[in-house]
UniProtKB/Swiss-Prot annotation:
Record gene name: udk
Keywords annotated in UniProt: ATP-binding, Cytoplasm, Kinase, Nucleotide-binding, Transferase
Cellular component, GO, one term: cytoplasm
Subcellular location: Cytoplasm
Superkingdom of this protein's organism: Bacteria
Reaction(s) the record says it catalyses: uridine + ATP = UMP + ADP + H(+); cytidine + ATP = CMP + ADP + H(+)
Stated name of the protein: Uridine kinase
Pathway this chain belongs to: Pyrimidine metabolism; CTP biosynthesis via salvage pathway; CTP from cytidine: step 1/3; Pyrimidine metabolism; UMP biosynthesis via salvage pathway; UMP from uridine: step 1/1
SUPFAM superfamilies per UniProt: P-loop containing nucleoside triphosphate hydrolases
MF terms (GO), sorted A to Z: ATP binding; cytidine kinase activity; uridine kinase activity
Organism: Geobacillus kaustophilus (strain HTA426)
Cross-referenced Pfam families: PRK
Binding site for ATP: 12-19
InterPro entries for the chain: P-loop_NTPase, PRK/URK, Uridine_kinase, Uridine_kinase-like
Example GO biological process: CTP salvage
C-alpha cells in the first residue's frame, strides 16, 4: 500500500482555541511529518474591489473563503506535491502578493472556523474535530488577537462581534458541530482530549501505511 497523508479538520468559533489544538497536535509529531493549513489564509482575493468595499467584508460568512483553492491545495498535498499557500493582508483587506511554499507532509491539519461547513472539505478529512469553548472566553481571545495582531480598536472589535461574529457563529459555525467525529471542550488546554487525538492519528497513519 502506498503512502497517503491523513487530513484532520479542526473547526470551532473564533477564539475557541482551534490554533492551540492544532499546535498541540503539531508538537506531538514535529515539523518533519505534519503541516497546518489555516483557512484564514484562504480568504478570497479582493484586489479588484475599491478599499471602501473591502472594508465591508464579512469574514465570518462561508462566501468569504476561497474553498476552491483550499481544496485544490489539499488534493496536491495528498499527491505529495508542494503548494504555494496564499497570504492575506488584513490591513488592506485582500490577498497579498506574497505566498508561502509548503512542502507535503504525512499529516495535514486544516484549521478554521468553517472548515466543516463545506461538504467537499469534509469529504477530504479522515478526522473531523470541533473545538467547543464558552462564548465569553472566545470574545476575550478575539479582542486580544484583533487589537494586538490586526491593529483594531476595542470598540470596533466589540461592534463587529455583536453585529457580525456572534450571529454568523450561531448561523454557520455552531451547526457544523454535528459533523464532528470529536468535540473538544476547553481547546488546547484539554490535555486528555489532545492525547486521545494523537493516538487516533497514529492509528490512522498506520492504517494508511505512512508510519
Amino acid at each position: 500500500m502506498g503512502k497517503k497523508p491523513v487530513v484532520i479538520g479542526v473547526a470551532g468559533g473564533s477564539g475557541s482555541g482551534k490554533t492551540s489544538v492544532a499546535r498541540a497536535i503539531y508538537d506531538h509529531f514535529g515539523d518533519r511529518s505534519i503541516l497546518v493549513l489555516e483557512q484564514d489564509f484562504y480568504y478570497k482575493d479582493q484586489s479588484h474591489l475599491p478599499f471602501e468595499e473591502r472594508l465591508k467584508t464579512n469574514y465570518d460568512h462561508p462566501l468569504a473563503f476561497d474553498n476552491d483553492l483550499l481544496i485544490e491545495h489539499i488534493h496536491k498535498l495528498l499527491r505529495y506535491e508542494p503548494i504555494d499557500k496564499p497570504v492575506y493582508d488584513y490591513t488592506l483587506h485582500t490577498r497579498s502578493s506574497d505566498v508561502i511554499r509548503v512542502e507535503p507532509k504525512d499529516v495535514i491539519i486544516v484549521e478554521g472556523i468553517l472548515v466543516l461547513e463545506d461538504e467537499r472539505l469534509r469529504n477530504l478529512m479522515d478526522i473531523k474535530v470541533y473545538v467547543d469553548t464558552d462564548p465569553d472566553i472566545r470574545i476575550i481571545r478575539r479582542l486580544i488577537r484583533d487589537i494586538k495582531e490586526r491593529g483594531r480598536t476595542f470598540d470596533s472589535v466589540i461592534e463587529q462581534y455583536l453585529s457580525v461574529v456572534r450571529p454568523m457563529h450561531n448561523q454557520f459555525v455552531e451547526p457544523t458541530k454535528r459533523y464532528a467525529d470529536v468535540i473538544i471542550p476547553e481547546g488546547g488546554q484539554n490535555v486528555v482530549a489532545i492525547d486521545l487525538m494523537v493516538a487516533k492519528i497514529r492509528t490512522v497513519l498506520e492504517q494508511k501505511a505512512v508510519l
